[in-house]
Regions:
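Pol beta-like nucleotidyltransferase catalytic core
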Residues: 1-49, 53, 59-161, 168-267
Length: 267
């Protein structure tokens, strides 16, 4: 059995069931906690970077400057993955699965968080549409007034999805929930998402400022004409099944993918 010691736990519950104190344990440093790793203990230490670079830039700079402080680095980050001791991990999960009738056109959901540039972009787009008819806007607060994913996805053909960072494979529940509810994402996010999911079922733009122009086209030509296009329908079904592995918790996927690798650290 793998044993972990978490250092400076910043997210309650991560590895909790895998963290009994043990003399023969892997030292896990994640996100901002990487600052506490010591070079002399590198053979027993791993770094797990879950939040994106836009949220914890200093942690990424630290690991990038000191990759030798860790036996292994687990991350989605394209730069850090260039190191020989780095391995990819994605903590995205599907929160909701439905195959309901699509009776509404376009939605967007945002919280009040404005900690990074793309948080601000999401809020700006939501504010632009809050008094317009083209998009149904859902405002929630992650701490006091959360919005259920079902509310803005289940019956919607399209939903605006802006990730918190732009990188090759930084994708989260934001787009995975779209795939699992057969909602087409109007997407700003992972630049290589097409290597994991069917791009014909994604309306991807490079910059969030392009979203209104795309919305105008969808509205002018009709959401149904896009959504029920045979090519789009085939891609929607394809992505619905491609996202199935993400219904497994990211921790279970992590242990499945890297359990044997970590066992060797303890032998």
């Amino acid at each position: 059995m793998l044993h972990f010691k978490e250092h400076h736990r910043l997210y309650s519950g991560f590895f909790q069931e895998l963290c009994p104190e043990s003399d023969n344990a892997i030292d896990v440093y994640y996100d901002q906690a990487v600052w506490y790793a010591k070079k002399e203990n590198a053979k027993n230490q791993i770094a797990i970077l879950l939040e994106p670079r836009s949220m914890i830039k200093d942690a990424y700079l630290y690991v990038g400057a000191h990759p030798d402080y860790f036996k292994y680095i687990f991350t989605h980050d394209s730069f850090l993955l260039s190191f020989d001791n780095a391995h990819e991990v994605n903590w995205g999960n599907v929160w909701l699965t439905t195959d309901s009738e699509k009776t509404k056109d376009i939605s967007i959901c945002t919280s009040s968080k404005d900690w990074c540039p793309l948080h601000k972009a999401r809020i700006e787009i939501a504010n632009y549409y809050k008094n317009r008819s083209e998009v149904d806007v859902f405002f929630g607060d992650w701490n006091t007034k959360p919005v259920e994913a079902k509310d803005y996805l289940e019956h919607y053909k399209f939903s605006i999805v802006i990730e918190n960072d732009i990188d090759d494979f930084w994708y989260t529940e934001k787009i995975l929930n779209c795939f699992a509810t057969k909602t087409i994402p109007i997407y700003v996010g992972a630049t290589k998402i097409s290597e994991r999911f069917n791009p014909s079922g994604i309306c991807q733009v490079k910059d969030w400022n392009e979203i209104p122009a795309l919305i105008d086209i969808i509205v002018r030509l009709g959401a149904d004409s896009f959504y029920y296009n045979p090519i789009m329908q085939e891609a929607i079904e394809d992505n619905f099944y491609r996202c199935v592995p993400y219904k497994i918790s990211w921790k279970d996927r992590f242990i499945h993918d890297y359990g044997q690798l970590l066992e060797k650290m303890m032998s």
